Regions:
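Bacterial Sec-dependent N-terminal signal peptides
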Residues: 1-20
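Helix-turn-helix repeat elements of alpha-solenoid scaffolds
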Residues: 32-46, 79-90, 124-132, 171-176
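Hydrophobic, well-structured mid-protein blocks that either form specific transmembrane helices
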Residues: 81-133
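Outer-membrane beta-barrel transmembrane domain signature
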Residues: 123-147, 154-165
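Amphipathic alpha-helical repeat scaffolds of TPR domains
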Residues: 17-30, 53-75, 100-119, 144-159, ...
């Protein structure tokens, strides 16, 4: 009887895990294909439902935040703060389940960048500084993560030449990101693997 119960419990755990994996794979594909704010909002809500159902998995909270972040970068300025704040709330939940994770720090970097872009001149010292701190933390945790150099390049690309930025400074970082993507292997197929095309596109923009 005990053995039978153990088999049934193991089977139930496997089925739940398999269901989680399938739901995540479906939503990651939807996130990759999303083009509009509405599509990103829908996939963010779907990831959040998975996260709240599972309770112990950080990745659905992370992806819900990423969907909000991508939506935030394209949003009107008057909406950017609220969207970035929602992403930060989700990332706090992810971080409570998975501390010291480079991907979470990179997402926090992007959320702070969205806040900063609302008014770069007045927000650089606060949100710009926070974004830089999160990027440095991600690099310390995972120096071979290609998204580190993509986001570092993005920061320099958007910084005026007179302040140490510009295309010439950004291009080597985008090139390094592309090169690292050639050997980068995520932990599994649910882990973050976005950014190679973005980095390659930015190399072209720097020419």
């Amino acid at each position: 009887m005990v053995c039978m119960m153990m088999v049934l419990l193991a089977g139930g755990t496997y089925a739940q895990s398999d269901k989680f994996k399938q739901a995540m794979e479906t939503n990651i594909s939807s996130l990759d294909a999303a083009k509009s704010a509405a599509e990103l909002q829908n996939v963010a809500a779907s990831f959040e439902r998975i996260a709240n159902a599972e309770k112990t998995q950080w990745l659905p909270f992370y992806y819900a935040a990423i969907a909000n972040i991508w939506k935030g970068f394209a949003a009107p300025k008057e909406e950017m703060d609220d969207i970035a704040t929602q992403a930060e709330i989700l990332l706090t939940k992810a971080e409570a389940l998975e501390a010291n994770n480079a991907e979470i720090f990179l997402a926090k970097n992007m959320a702070s960048t969205i806040h900063m872009l609302v008014d770069p001149q007045t927000r650089w010292q606060t949100y710009g500084s926070k974004a830089a701190q999160d990027l440095a933390a991600a690099k310390k945790l995972d120096a071979n993560n290609p998204r580190v150099y993509f986001l570092e390049g993005q920061s320099l690309f958007g910084t005026p030449v007179q302040f140490g930025g510009g295309k010439d400074k950004a291009k080597p970082l985008f090139e390094k990101s592309v090169a690292l993507f050639d050997t980068y292997k995520p932990v599994n197929n649910l882990y973050p693997n976005w950014g190679k095309k973005n980095a390659a596109d930015m190399v072209e923009q720097c020419k």
